[in-house]
Amino acid sequence: EYLTSNTKSLLDNGYADNSELSAKGKNVIVIGGGDTGTDCIGTSLRQGAKSITNFELMSQPPEVRSESNPWPEWPVIFRVDYGHEESNKVFGKDPRQYQLLTKSFIKDKDGHVSGIKTVNVELVDGKLNEIDGTEKTWDAELVLLSMGFLSPEHYLSEDANIDIDERGNYKAKHGE
């Protein structure tokens, strides 16, 4: 909704209707990455956010493709996209914080979000484990969710007895 409403307001009337959800003067947290997360970072920057932090659940990817990630798989490597680069120029640092799990949202007396509680996590044997003593509270007046998806919902596959692979996607034979 954030990106859509801002683009619509800009294109319809140059923000004259004040209908867009603005990051101006706010501590912004973007939960999740990818293209949508980068767009949320860039839009928040252009609106004059006070700060921007981007939470990533997984660890920072390696600089080069690992042997366990061969071609033709999508290369899982560290990338700096336009939003990260712009944020670095404005705030002097990359906005991404890795291996963070959001535990709860904090609200102010009026019921608006005012912060987030997190804990660091590590991936062990395919399972995310919380790291004791790493709890942290972050200021946030605007939280944007950009978590995407890893696999389809499974109620269809369960009802139709469709097998799923190790990533939770429907199993299929190539070419069928």
Where are these regions (language model features)?
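FAD-site-proximal beta/loop scaffold in flavoenzymes
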Residues: E1-G25, V124-E176
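A structured beta-alpha segment of the ubiquitous adenosine-cofactor-binding alpha/beta core
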Residues: A16-N18, E85-P95, Q99-E141
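Beta1/beta-strand and adjacent pyrophosphate-binding region of the FAD-binding site
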Residues: A23-G34
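Active-site proximal loops enriched in glycine and acidic residues that flank catalytic Cys/His/Asp
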Residues: G32-G33, E56-S59, Y98-L101, I106, ...
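N-terminal Rossmann-fold NAD(P) dinucleotide-binding loop
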Residues: G37-T38
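Rossmann-like dinucleotide-binding cores of NAD(P)H-dependent redox enzymes
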Residues: I41-L100, S104
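Short, solvent-exposed amphipathic alpha-helical segments in soluble enzyme
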Residues: S44-Q47, V121, A160-I162
